[in-house]
């Protein structure tokens, strides 16, 4: 919840807009999203999955982001309790309870460059790379991610610059995407 006062110049509009998931009060750097079903990827193969993820609320004065308000954030530890990373947590059952304007699909491209079949149950996505576009119908579109598995316990997750969905006429960029990578070293 946001509580505070904003000094607004008389001609600057104040707007509430969707924003990619943020680190919340703990300042976490990643989003751990658990898949509804396990996904098995054969050696040398690739596939894509779509996962619903939560959005936060951005408070803007003109084109300036004032603050981000996380909407019902949940947290989980990825890895062992003494070395793991605290992440923002998302799963299908949590996100389905949110209003459609507070969630969006993310496309995650899974690629297996190992020599064995891998089972993928989750993805840990760096938050700082996620961007957000708005469609002509005012639908929020988050940027996609790529998960490349090197072994049963090691993968690289990289954010991409394009929206997860191909929608005609997407031109409004609300949050600039960047390429960021997270190394999943505690299993898939």
Task: Describe the residue ranges of each PLM region.
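Interface-prone segments of viral and bacterial extracellular assemblies
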Residues: 1-188
